[in-house]
Regions:
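Extracellular and organelle-lumenal recognition/adhesion modules and their flexible linkers in secreted
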Residues: 1-181, 199-201, 216-230, 279, ...
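Conserved, mostly hydrophobic/aromatic
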Residues: 27, 130, 193, 239, ...
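An active-site-proximal structural segment forming one wall of the substrate-binding cleft
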Residues: 77-82, 86-89, 110-131, 181-196, ...
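Active-site groove signature of glycoside hydrolases
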Residues: 93-95, 101, 109, 137-140, ...
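Aromatic-lined carbohydrate-recognition surfaces of secreted/lumenal glycan-active proteins
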Residues: 136, 203-205, 250-260, 293-314, ...
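Glycoside hydrolase catalytic-domain groove-lining segments
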Residues: 165, 170-183, 188, 278-279, ...
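Aromatic/acidic polysaccharide-binding cleft in carbohydrate-active enzymes
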Residues: 208-211, 357-420
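Substrate-binding cleft/loops of secretory-pathway carbohydrate-active enzymes
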Residues: 211-224, 231, 257-264, 306-340, ...
Length: 420
């Protein structure tokens, strides 16, 4: 940008600034000149000449002195009043007389949960529930709209400024896509599990894009051929080293140590695929399972039964598990049903097999709605989970968090929050 131009960046979905709290700002810049940075309200960042209304008296002047290379500059702000506004954001202005390139503009509160970047009140809400494990990073994002947009855990670690940005499956619009910066990546998820005393349960892509969106997933845009599957299996093997490895000559152990965590995370579970189903899935899953069990026999592997509580894909999955129970420690079931369905199916697991190695992991479940009746129906259903704890070894309500006014998914959510 050239003087007297600048940029105004609204904090994503707005933010709350608290009087007396500190906020760490950073920017990567290239060139020689001055940047003036302040906090304020962005009236309309889409205008060619945007309007801003500063609310913090203190502004910072950053002297940029790297002509040819990118350099990171940082400054800390202390908010001098309270502000919660839809337009709250960062104003960066070039006050010098030369061109400057800027990238990776960041503003983070210093007061976060255990100093690891996550919002303290949300983590404290989660902590109060005494969770035993966390399934991450979620569901369909792992699969991707196509294989090119599938989540790759290796893109989500290391310096945040160097992580590969990726389109999110929940809004893949070509004109207004929802992008993932991977600022919350696998390292942060492992760290979150450690901070909250949870077992990490990462889910990896199995070489198949989202089957719900792609139908039969028969072309290479959506389905990795068997003779090209090995890199995906290697990703799983490398993740085990990243999480559990102690050999400091290993590339992925080195990366974990470089990020500040010398000790292993002691991961015990890995899920292969999110809601995949059918013969094309189990053909690929078997290759993952054989190689992982051969090298890391103590890792518990999670397979999946698809997207429904019953039907052909669910039946096929359990029939496969009955014949290959040595390859799967958990069967991940997902279903979102009506409140009446949950009330009527409290006895669902009474007749499941008990003499098999493959136990149930109810990885996603919720009744469709957010009324008291939904909660009561789910509670009734959960009595069946507890009664059959020898069959249902793990269960996780989903989704975990939802922000008021900013959800794509409204069928059910566990913890609702706003800016404050």
């Amino acid at each position: 940008m050239t003087e007297p131009n600048g940029i105004a960046i609204k904090v994503h979905l707005s933010a709350e600034f608290k009087n007396g709290e500190k906020y760490d700002f950073s920017v990567y810049a290239r060139g020689e000149g001055e940047l003036t940075v302040s906090l304020g309200i962005v009236i309309d960042e889409h205008k060619a000449s945007f309007e801003v209304e500063p609310f913090n008296e203190a502004a910072a002047v950053i002297k940029c002195n790297s002509k040819d290379d990118w350099k990171k500059y940082s400054v800390t702000f202390t908010a001098d009043e309270e502000l919660e506004s839809d337009g709250s954001g960062i104003i960066v202005t070039n006050t010098g007389d030369s061109d400057l390139d800027v990238d990776m503009v960041s503003l983070m509160p210093e007061d976060t949960y255990k100093g690891h970047g996550l919002r303290k009140d949300l983590m404290e809400q989660l902590e109060a529930m005494h969770p035993k494990f966390l399934r991450f990073p979620g569901g369909c994002a792992v699969e991707g709209q196509t294989m090119d947009t599938a989540w790759n855990w290796k893109d989500t670690i290391g310096d945040v400024s160097e992580r590969k940005e990726m389109i999110n499956i929940w809004n893949p619009s070509a004109t207004e896509p929802y992008m993932m910066t991977y600022g919350l990546g696998f390292y942060e998820y492992f760290q979150m599990c450690e901070d909250l005393g949870m077992e990490p349960v990462p889910i990896l892509n199995c070489g198949i894009a989202c089957q719900v969106r792609s139908g039969s997933a028969t072309d290479e845009e959506h389905l990795v051929p068997m003779d090209k599957l090995q890199p995906y299996i290697d990703d799983a093997l490398d993740l085990i080293e990243f999480a559990n490895g102690t050999d400091e000559s290993n590339e992925w152990v080195q990366k974990r140590i470089q990020m500040g965590h010398k000790e292993p995370f002691n991961m015990k579970y890995i899920g292969i695929g999110n809601e995949q189903y059918g013969d094309i899935y189990f053909e690929r899953y078997e290759e993952f399972a054989k190689q992982i069990h051969e090298k890391y026999p103590d890792i518990n592997l999670v397979t999946t039964s698809g997207t429904a509580s019953s039907g052909s894909s669910n039946d096929l999955a359990w029939n496969w598990a009955n014949e290959h129970e040595e390859l799967a420690d958990r069967m991940d079931e997902h279903y979102y049903e009506t409140a009446d369905w949950f009330r009527q199916h409290a006895y669902r697991y009474d007749n499941y097999r008990r003499d098999t190695n493959t136990k149930v992991f109810l990885g996603e479940y919720a009744s469709k709605g957010n009324a008291w009746y939904n909660a009561l129906s789910e509670a009734a259903f959960m009595t069946g989970l507890e009664r059959n704890a020898d069959v249902v070894r793990m269960a996780s309500y989903a989704p975990m968090f939802a922000k008021y006014g900013n959800t794509q998914w409204s069928a059910a959510d566990m913890i609702w929050f706003n800016n404050s």
